[in-house]
Amino acid sequence: MKVTFEELKGAFYRVLRSRNIAEDTADACAEMFARTTESGVYSHGVNRFPRFIQQLDNGDIIPDAKPQRVTSLGAIEQWDAQRAIGNLTAKKMMDRAIELASDHGIGLVALRNANHWMRGGSYGWQAAEKGYIGICWTNSIAVMPPWGAKECRIGTNPLIVAIPSTPITMVDMSMSMFSYGMLEVNRLAGRELPVDGGFDDNGQLTKEPGVIEKNRRILPMGYWKGSGLSIVLDMIATLLSNGSSVAEVTQENSDEYGVSQIFIAIEVDKLIDGATRDAKLQRIMDFITTAERADDNVAIRLPGHEFTKLLDDNRRHGITIDDSVWAKIQAL
């Protein structure tokens, strides 16, 4: 089914206000969920909203909490999220990293006791739109086996790197081949994954998203490489924030809350003039996209460039929502 941005935001706002969330907080949160969905990231927008409400109802998320700065060391700050709403807090933290970068050239905010930030790419994009390089990542509850194991002991720990090119170039990726959100998107659409994404009941690689969801055995991105990256990203976020590691979140909490996150902004224009920056970025992009295609019908992709078209399509033709997901939201 198709809905407009206003209909989608209104549905989110209604549910939030029914939980006695303050009007301004409900409006800002509904706006972010709707923008994420409108951008084409359904897995961490509309599809994730019922799960968000479940955690809100369970008390994992404290909607009126205010993040507090704990430590300030020039370009580096450490904050405690106080388990406030994840996407609103993450936006504030990237804004703060940008402010620090304006003063120091680089800004780093380490956040502890945070909630799921929904679409991590929103915060990298937020920096790149203002002309900064944006880098951020989060740890999570253990939802992926480390390479060589059957049990989930590491997080998907998504990493975002956004570059202020035209259009914005951005990598937004979990350390698994597919996030659980993307497994759900493909399952709801009745699609196999384009490549192996996890293991079946017999320990064999499979493209069946439903089987992987059931078994909780997703495949690390790049096999041992994604597993290794997940571990070191967790270590850095834990140390810089003085927060909880994947092990602590998994073993000490009843659900995924109290995670640790990093937000970095770099003001490129302090290091290179605008014309030179743009020329260098354009040369990189041209060099890549003019390569001979492996398939004449498949364009060479630059990460993040597809979001401009997705956003335009959704604004022109309406936002496609899975009927079952929409029914869940209407029932909340």
Curated annotation (Swiss-Prot):
Its EC number is 1.1.1.130. Pfam families: Ldh_2 (PF02615). NAD(+) binds at I168, T169, M170, V171, D172, M173, S174, W224, K225, G304, H305, E306. It comes from the Bacteria. It is an enzyme of class 1 (oxidoreductase). The keyword NAD applies. It is found in: Cytoplasm. One of its GO terms (cellular component) is cytoplasm. Gene3D superfamilies: 1.10.1530.10, Hypothetical oxidoreductase yiak, domain 2, Hypothetical oxidoreductase yiak, domain 3. Keywords: Cytoplasm, NAD, Oxidoreductase. One of its GO terms (molecular function) is 3-dehydro-L-gulonate 2-dehydrogenase activity. Homodimer. Catalyzes the reduction of 2,3-diketo-L-gulonate in the presence of NADH, to form 3-keto-L-gulonate. Belongs to the LDH2/MDH2 oxidoreductase family. DlgD subfamily. NCBIfam families: PRK13260.1 (NF009750). This is 2,3-diketo-L-gulonate reductase. It comes from Salmonella schwarzengrund (strain CVM19633). The gene is dlgD.
